[in-house]
Amino acid sequence: MDTSTELILIRITGLDRPGLTASITETLSHYDVTILDIGQADIHSTLSLGILFKSMKQDSGNIMKELLFKASDLGVNIRFYPVSVEEYEEWVSRQGKDRYILTLLGRKLTAKQITAVTSILAEQGLNIDAIKRLTGRQPLDECKSNVRACIELSVRGTPRDREEMQRNLMQLSSELAMDFSFQRDNMYRRMRRLICFDMDSTLIQTECIDELAERAGVGEQVRAITESAMRGEIDFKESFTQRVALLKGLDESVMKEIAENLPITEGVERLMFVLKRYGYKIAILSGGFTYFGEYLQKKFGIDYVYANELEIIDGKLTGRYLGDVVDGKRKVELLRLIAQVEKVDIAQTIAVGDGANDLPMLSLAGLGIAFHAKPKVVANAKQSINTIGLDGVLYFLGFKDSYLEERGKF
């Protein structure tokens, strides 16, 4: 660097108000300085502004003097830090390091949660570059059911042991009642285009086959098989065949009644509204039944539904199904197929589910999210949501409440 120039970092703090940044940079503009870096944050109307600039040495004294007077007039604090060429070059060299986004989400965020998470990042050699809040300002009344808090940490570096870090974060999420997502910060994170959902216990808060079984008087038998399958203890296809056989003779009208009263999962309406508004393609890939999937398709404008079709003859279930069973392997095939049809890279896909048969598609998708999932699924997933509704997915995609609310209330 030219020895006639020098680098100076200024840090300004104080009560924020319109025009403050303009006033500071106007002073700098009198000396035609080069801005090398600038960052600003506002927390509870308190400003923190940092500017790194290069100026002629002969001007530095006058610049600092004028800035001191300006800061006094504005009622803010200002400090000056000289930056050596070596320090600056070292800072520039770090820009080639890997970047990640760690999203923390919950009904509320506590100092204990943030301490635990940031300690793990430090142990892994990761540095936090920035932190921002994605959710709106929190009310003091914590009793409100729709309250949630989310922050996004931009971190830099390469984890020393990615698998160990993932395990530790997942353990914390269970112990401290919070959700997290750790994603590479690249172009695909901002360009997700296809999202595939499991249906039962994900989009809806029930297992449809259990509802049918109750009406058929075989609830206990079917429920036991369902739970065993979702835990991954028995093959899904085998369990499905056993359960469907127990429904033989049930009247078709029962399915209509159940469909009209499906308990929709918290946050689904908001999530679907936003996804459709921003042009995402949406699919249901379910080990449940097409009858209920198509009902949700009409309700929310879902683009694709792949599930299992029950055979019905003379208005009665026969105890058999038509076509291939949609199991974990089939969900992967369908995700690939839809991505190909939509001309979407697999890295641009999202998969959300709760059961063992969802794990293959969660692993394949660019972003796989376990939602209120079984322990085996949570243990093998890279992202999970357990504390809030399904619209928590939006925060993992980087959406901010303030940004969404500008485009319509939910």
Language-model features, listed with the residues they occupy:
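A conserved regulatory-domain signal marking ACT and ACT-like small-molecule sensing domains
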Residues: 1-192
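Solvent-exposed alpha-helical segments within well-ordered globular domains of core cellular machineries
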Residues: 22, 26, 65, 69, ...
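C-terminal cap/substrate-recognition subdomain and adjoining C-terminal extension
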Residues: 249-410
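Long, charged amphipathic helices and adjacent flexible linkers at domain junctions
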Residues: 87-96, 182-193, 226-252, 316, ...
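Active-site neighborhood of HAD-like aspartate-dependent phosphohydrolases
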Residues: 187-237
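Short hydrophobic segments within beta-strands
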Residues: 105-107, 196-198, 285, 352
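Short glycine/serine/threonine-rich phosphate/pyrophosphate-binding segments
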Residues: 20, 113, 203-206, 358-361
